[in-house]
Amino acid sequence: MNLNDFDFLLPDKLIADRPVSPRSSSKLLVSKKLEQFMDEKFYNLPKLLSSNDLLIFNDTKVIPTRLKGKRIRGNSSSLINATLISYDKDDCWLTLIKPLRKINIGECLNFNDGVKAELIDKSEGFGVLKFNIKKNNFSAFLSRQGFMPLPPYIEKRRASDSRDIKDYQSIFAKYDGAVAAPTASLHFDHEVLKDLEHLGVKSSFVTLHVGAGTFLPVKEINIKNHKMHTEWGCVDQSTVDKIIEAKSRGGRVIPVGTTACLLYTSDAADEGLGVDLGGRRI
């Protein structure tokens, strides 16, 4: 497939930079048959499901890993944004830095709370920062100074702020590890979950920590040549049992969003259901 086949016009006025409130008041496009579409509200989702169905959610939790810092050179300084992707070793973190191109290896970047980091390597759009703070102290530092990483199309319109801590986290997020939220999950609120439970719709969870690739553009004209970054995922035995049970009673297994779908299908295709997939390209 050619990358240009996916180009289309989307007017700026149709792009929201904040989610609707309440969450479940968002729009829902329903396709019952090929080329037959209906506009709905998300809070009506329970009416489209049956008691035999099983929803699979991704319970990953987004870490506020976006840091705002300064690059100081002589008497001048410039602002930089650094999004921590993963811990390497020896207080080093793989980081998405903007603007990385202008920063030289060996330069020191300054963050709040007296935290500093040296750029010790950079390649393929990422930098490796060595911090003057230990890994076991990083969670407390991020809770004070970290912001939620936002999609690039929103970043162009506004800066990340404290509201995003809640807005870009699903209500059932449990396990720390993602740099971005599994977006489909953000539409669910407690009322919708209660309605689903009342109707007898079952649910279960998988964990896929959304990785750095979600923020990187596809540059290959032939998208088959695009290299995906690794992501960690797990489908536990409890979820496997619920999937088998749902299929045995004639129900549908419905992954919520692409992250849950990719993990579910990758697990089944490669290993058979029920494994810790670890870090892999899925």
Name each model-derived stretch.
Residues M1-S266:
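Surface-exposed, charge/polar-rich loops and edge strands
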Residues Y264-I282:
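Single conserved hydrophobic/aromatic residue that forms the stacking wall/gate
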